[in-house]
């Protein structure tokens, strides 16, 4: 099992809102420097434009740094998942996260079943796992029903309990419901804050260990160390007063999250290039 960083852990530092946004190579280097053992390139469209030579350069640099790569995308379209499978093979990736819906397609449960059954034989052939993420756009029971119906070692759940609150699903219930099918974990904390004037609440991210995520219960239920399930750090960090302050806080949250997780997972794999 390894602990890693998602591109979502670099959300603001890689965005156009900051003066010198990080590119993919810089995020990979910083992942290694942090001591994390995995870099999940998630919802990062630029990776789709990389040439075979550029993919090989990225793969080799990850090998040199002792970093395991993972991929993340959205949607179940056959051509799209086949494309990501090809990229995964080029990058020595063993896990791809996806979601039911893309920007242009929202399949029914039956359509999702048919689409996944079309591509999963290739995933099984190349020993690459596909994880369907839990999130508010599709009820967790519906996602789980598809995974259960297919019952393939190449298909599981990418568990992110915080996403499901917007669908009025309790995080602890989502954890219990999906536990046996989880193959990847997204770790971020979250909290409600009452707005000024008592006119509603904001639901957003917070420093890991200070919000509503019961990490110890999650860890006890999922048993990531025993089951070799990678834990990937993400953030829902609101924009701060300035780009400088936002980037500083994002980096601080990342370092805190890694320390928090390694303290509770002392045998997790680490990068070989810790500074």
From Swiss-Prot:
Q: Recite the UniProt keywords alphabetically.
A: Carbohydrate metabolism, Decarboxylase, Lyase
Disulfide feature = none
**UniProt key word Lyase:** yes
Record-level Gene Ontology MF annotations = carboxy-lyase activity
Q: Where is the signal peptide?
A: none
Cite the annotated pathway: Carbohydrate metabolism
Cited function: Involved in catabolism of D-apiose. Catalyzes decarboxylation of 3-oxo-isoapionate to L-erythrulose.
Name recorded for this polypeptide: 3-oxo-isoapionate decarboxylase
Q: Which organism is it from?
A: Pectobacterium atrosepticum (strain SCRI 1043 / ATCC BAA-672) (Erwinia carotovora subsp. atroseptica)
State the encoding gene.
oiaC
